[in-house]
Curated annotation (Swiss-Prot):
GO molecular function, one term: RNA binding
Annotated CDD domains: Ras_like_GTPase (cd00882), YlqF (cd01856)
Top-level division of the source organism's lineage: Bacteria
Swiss-Prot/TrEMBL GO biological process terms: ribosome biogenesis; translation
Full protein name: Ribosome biogenesis GTPase A
Family stated for the protein in its record: Belongs to the TRAFAC class YlqF/YawG GTPase family. MTG1 subfamily.
Residues reported to bind GTP: N58, K59, A60, D61, N86, S87, N130, V131, G132, K133, S134, T135, G174
Listed Pfam families: MMR_HSR1
Function: Essential protein that is required for a late step of 50S ribosomal subunit assembly. Has GTPase activity that is stimulated by interaction with the immature 50S ribosome subunit. Binds to the 23S rRNA. Required for the association of ribosomal proteins RplP and RpmA with the large subunit.
One GO CC term on file: cytoplasm
Additional note from the record: Estimated to be present at 1000 copies per cell.
Disruption-associated phenotype: Essential for growth, it cannot be disrupted. In depletion experiments cells become over 3-fold longer, are abnormally curved and nucleoids condense.
């Protein structure tokens, strides 16, 4: 599955982010806790250089908690502070400012020693589309400032947002790479809804989701669709799910498009519980 999706505003965002780094104290890199590595754009490393950073594992309520802990340890071992958060209900957000102060303490101590008046922390929020940047900003600012939605790419311009007296945030459009080198990265992004459904082969995504569930969460798969056993043949598995869910056409034939929609919707709406689609060792 080849996915290419790189709107012009994303290329512009990269240039503007690079320019704004001089104004920034710290970067909040927002990733999807279900796919922390796949939801990181490799070129972000090149853009950020050695800027202080906090990795925010968003949508942690949707991810397998044990796997999320593995990821936090993985990033900490790389010298990157990481926090589990939920930008929708605010879980973990109260840790962001204290963690930022701790990381930036030496910098602000030097500023005070030079007689520079203390100011708010200036942070840049960066991440791929649909990872929850706008929702996070709105939650922190307690206002509906940034546009939000479940369509990837909804934030199209950069803006500064004041969060109390201690923090100023710069939101950026989601930055996605031009072409996925690894097909699995594209599939993981697609199954979690980070890529527009209109540009992907949804049946490929459903097959990926089923195979993943079969390998890592087989009991949940059987329970959800009332299966005694999971057929080895993927077509038979589709047939079984389509039949169980009433995805039928005239003559009793399986409607594969409808079955595909059911599978993907069930995954995205947590009908299988909390799922993590990659681990640090994968």
């Amino acid at each position: 599955m080849t996915i290419q999706w790189f709107p012009g505003h994303m290329a512009k965002a990269r240039r503007e982010v690079t320019e704004k780094l001089k104004l920034i104290d710290i970067v909040y890199e927002l990733v999807d806790a279900r796919i922390p590595m796949s939801s990181r754009n490799p070129m972000i490393e090149d853009i950020l250089k050695n800027k202080p950073r906090i990795m925010l594992l968003n949508k942690a309520d949707k991810a397998d908690a044990a796997v999320t802990q593995q990821w936090k340890e993985h990033f900490e071992n790389q010298g990157i502070r990481s926090l589990s958060i939920n930008s929708v209900n605010g879980q973990g957000l109260n840790q962001i400012v204290p963690a930022s102060k701790e990381i930036l303490q030496e910098k602000f101590d030097r500023m005070r020693a030079k007689g520079v008046k203390p100011r708010a922390i200036r942070a840049l929020i960066i991440g791929i589309p649909n990872v929850g940047k706008s929702t996070l900003i709105n939650r922190l600012a307690k206002k509906n400032i940034a546009k939000t939605g479940d369509r990837p790419g909804i934030t199209t311009s950069q803006q500064w947002v004041k969060v109390g007296k201690e923090l100023e945030l710069l939101d950026t459009p989601g930055i996605l790479w031009p072409k996925f080198e690894d097909e699995l990265v594209g599939l993981r992004l697609a199954v979690t809804g980070a890529i527009k459904d209109s540009i992907i082969n949804l049946q490929d995504v459903a097959v990926f989701g089923l195979r993943f569930l079969e390998e890592h969460y087989p009991e949940r798969l059987k329970e959800r669709y009332g299966l005694d056993e999971i057929p080895e043949d993927i077509a038979e598995l589709f047939d079984a799910i389509g039949e169980k869910r009433g995805c039928l056409m005239s003559g009793g034939l399986i409607n594969y498009d409808k079955t595909t929609e059911v599978i993907i919707r069930d995954i995205r709406t947590e009908k299988f519980g909390r799922l993590s689609f990659e681990q640090p060792t994968m």
